[in-house]
Amino acid sequence: MFLATLPIDQAVGHILRHNIVDAAGHKVLPKGKRLTDDEVTRLRGLGIAAVRVAVLEPGDVHEDEAARRLAAVVCRPGVTATEAVHSRVNLFAEADGVVEVDGAALLAINTIDGLTIATLPNHALIRRRKRVATIKIIPFALPKALVQQAERIGFEAGGVVGVRPLLPRRVGVLLVASPEARERITRLVLPAIESRVAELGSMVCAVRYVKPDEHEVAEGIAALRADGNDLLITAGETSIMDRDDVTPQGIRLAGGRIEHYGAPVEPGNLLLLAYLEDGTPQGMPIIGAPGCVRSRATNIVDLLLPRLLSGERVTRRDIIELGHGGLLER
């Protein structure tokens, strides 16, 4: 592709580089328009003798075709691409879910001059029909070799952006508190947990109370598991203060494994994540919620719960990586 200013009679088939306006300032033709005979005649009637155009050369790929081709290899399951309009394709979520972005592939494609992809943050919660990403081709055309380079990156990565749908899960809540504090803890903690879970398409199906004793915690976990719950959330009078505190000990007695304790996220530093193995790739997650779970202000639980409810097995490394952006200012 090269840029030129051509006499109007030589402009047919080339791409208009700038908007054309009439004497009153009204737009006659938009930039990016491939000029036809009729449009050239119209411009001649306005007294226009020459126009600035982009001239495509053999091997060039028009901006809209380039955007379509890139979208075809960028999309992972869970997203739908629009038609290309003005060199842009938007990707929308097919269902409520969690955004998945291959950051390395995204960086590699965006390094190619003239190609851009902007996405929501990896692991962000997304709602159905909301925009997840946008593809924009900068010039009016790209050399075929650059488009093919981007296609190879997307193909080898298995796509760049997708949405893992939220699954309707049964959630059990274990409240660890003395009998004297149960009413207060229930009032402070349970509504916030129930509303969080409901907003993500799942339901709190069982609530059990135990005293702060590791054996009672283990029995409560076993009972909630037997009730058919898919995910457990524990909360209590205080946050879990150590890997060997009462709740972690109870989780181990119940057969669980502590994945990680302590998160580089504020609010939510005193988070615990554990799993009970159940024969599935994810296992049964157990969130040991910190005290901030009582508030509906965004905290560590809001970062992890959607991912767990979409079936992801969140790891120690995943939690550690939350430190970049982990200061959640209220």
What are these regions (language model features)?
Residues 78-81, 120-124, 137-139, 157-165, ...:
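A generic local secondary-structure boundary/capping motif
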Residues 53, 79-84, 142-144, 203-207, ...:
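Flexible, glycine/charged-enriched surface loops at secondary-structure junctions
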Residues 178, 205-330:
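Short glycine/threonine-rich loop/turn motifs
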Residues 139-231:
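Phosphate-binding glycine-rich loops and their immediate beta-loop-alpha structural context
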